[in-house]
Amino acid sequence: MLVAGRALRPADLWDQPLIISHQRSDDRRLAQWMQRDLSQLHIVATYNLVFNASLLVDEGLGYALCFDKLINTRGSSLCFRPFAPRLESPAYIIWKKYQVFFKAATAFLSCLKQLTEQ
């Protein structure tokens, strides 16, 4: 069982059942942070949608590695613990070059642009 209320270090996760993203773009970064090759870890499942990973965690299958605030944990048995040292990964938003957006999508992109310029 992982200690509640504190950040997780690589050694805390070495022998734990892990659920990781199916996307392979961050494997090298994760392995470097974990100080282990991914083949040395106890990976019990991978996911494409973090919501599906949350269902596996809720059933006690393992611990999902994911970005914070993707799953609303309020009122559930799930909780988020940050990594120490911090592990960061870039994220990208892409769209068609001449895409016509609805008002909501235009407002969303405008907010994203403002946030990334700060």
Predicted stretch roles:
Residues 20, 39-52:
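Short beta-strand-to-loop elements that line the ligand-binding cleft
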Residues 1, 18, 61-62, 117:
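Generic structural signal for secondary-structure transition and capping sites
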Residues 20-21, 46, 64, 94:
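Active-site-adjacent beta-strand anchor residues
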Residues 6, 12, 51-100:
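Beta-alpha-beta core module
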Residues 94-118:
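Extended ligand-binding regions for polar small-molecule ligands
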Residues 2, 10, 16-39, 101-105:
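Secondary-structure junction motif
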Residues 26, 47, 69:
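Residue-level "edge-of-site" marker
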